[in-house]
A protein has these predicted regions:
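Short, solvent-exposed loop/turn elements at beta->coil junctions and helix N-caps
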Residues: 118-124, 340-343
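Iron-sulfur (Fe-S) cluster-binding segments and ferredoxin-like electron-carrier domains
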Residues: 79, 86-101
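Terminal RNA-binding accessory module
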Residues: 1-77, 149
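Hydrophobic beta-strand signal
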Residues: 41-43, 133, 217
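Short cysteine clusters
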Residues: 73, 81-84, 316
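Non-catalytic substrate-recognition/targeting regions of SAM-dependent transferases
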Residues: 12, 56, 126-195
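A short, contiguous, amphipathic alpha-helix enriched in charged residues
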Residues: 98-111, 163-164
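Rossmann-like S-adenosyl-L-methionine
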Residues: 1-4, 169-357
């Protein structure tokens, strides 16, 4: 089956960087490197007769979308690097596709109809990524994985990476946001877009509307980015507790927040900590930035049990966010606003900041 080719009409965008199409026999295809409305030759890359859908690449464009452009990267396209999904689409149209995915996931998983706009961030869709993980290539150089594969595409440069994140460059270990400097452990998590930290801090603070004296929980706190600015907003009469499960990130957070007496760092699993008697039973505001899989029921229930007046939920996966929004609704917290940011241009990924009250 792999390698077979079909002429298909491409439908709506799907969650994961593909568009949905059907063969004449009704077989569902998830087609990469295509755009809605195009007619393409799709070559099957994964699938057997018993599968509910097959994965495919658009290897020939028979009728092109007006939103199609020539990919700037020579490694983008079928069989190349798997990092970027939408280099063949105009930047504004990429954001439209991502907005459609967010709306569809909220409608399908949270039963919420919401018009979403994905906001552009930065001046360019290239040269934005400050952290990269390259793998050794057989030729002795560096490369990136192909899509859904362990095979390596050797590259000489990555066009979405900054000059300091090209192959052979040392990893990011320190970052400046506003007037604060953050220690970042080697290999630890840090927002990859160079403008993401300030963008998200501004969005979180705008949603949280913190007051002097507030008690704030910052869950999945990483190296303390949100906690640092929340501490400034609540003042020394307030309190910020930052909870992070990764020991190296928690150690960096303690260093980064050491000048803020109202901030405290707890190195612990978030769900277990919320269940423990050591955690406070109340909070005015909860900020959480869970991993891609989402917060899930145990954490959502633990957060809501604190009865905060506001929950600010940062999410990098629309489906996980929608599932969590549905869980919040079960606990009486409704989605009041949602902002989406194009922090991952050229890819299908998108960042959301949701306010629930």
């Amino acid at each position: 089956m792999v390698g077979s080719r079909f002429e298909v009409d491409c439908g709506q965008v799907g969650h994961g960087g593909f568009v949905v199409a059907r063969t004449d026999e009704g077989r569902v295809l998830f087609v990469r490197h295509a755009l809605p409305g195009e007619r393409v030759i799709a070559e099957i890359t994964e699938g057997t007769t018993g599968d509910s859908f097959w994965r495919a690449d658009a290897v020939q464009i028979l009728s092109a979308s007006p939103h199609r452009v020539t990919p700037p990267c020579p490694y983008a396209g079928p069989g190349g690097c798997g990092g970027c999904d939408f280099q063949h689409a105009r930047s504004d149209y990429q954001r439209e596709l991502k907005a459609a995915v967010i709306s569809e996931q909220l409608r399908r998983l949270a039963k919420r109809d919401l018009t979403v706009e994905v906001e552009p961030v930065g001046e360019s869709s290239l040269g934005w990524r400050t952290t990269m993980t390259y793998v050794p290539a057989s030729g002795g150089g560096h490369g990136l994985r192909r899509h859904r594969s362990h095979e390596v595409q050797e590259i000489d440069q990555c066009l979405i990476a900054t000059a300091d994140a090209q192959p052979g460059c040392p990893p990011l270990t320190r970052a400046v946001v506003g007037e604060r400097t953050f220690d970042v452990p080697d290999g630890g998590f840090w927002q990859s877009h160079r403008d993401a930290p300030q963008t998200l801090v501004d969005a979180v603070l705008a949603a949280a509307r913190l007051r002097l004296g507030d008690r704030v929980l910052d869950l999945y706190a990483g190296v303390g980015l949100f906690a640092a600015f929340a501490a400034g907003a609540v003042g020394e009469s307030g309190q910020v507790i930052a909870v992070e499960g990764d020991p190296s990130a928690a150690a960096s957070a303690k260093l980064n927040l050491s000048d803020l007496p109202q901030a405290r760092v707890i190195a612990a699993d978030v769900a277990a900590w919320l269940d423990s008697s050591a955690s406070p039973q109340g909070a005015d505001v909860v900020v959480l930035d869970p991993p891609r899989a989402g917060a899930k029921r145990r954490v959502v229930e633990g957060v809501c049990q604190r009865e905060p007046r506001a929950i600010v939920h940062v999410a990098c996966d629309p489906a996980a966010l929608a599932r969590d929004v549905a869980l919040y609704a079960e606990q009486g917290y409704d989605l009041r606003s949602l902002r989406a940011f194009d922090l991952f241009p050229m890819t299908h990924h998108v960042e959301c900041v949701a306010l629930l009250t």
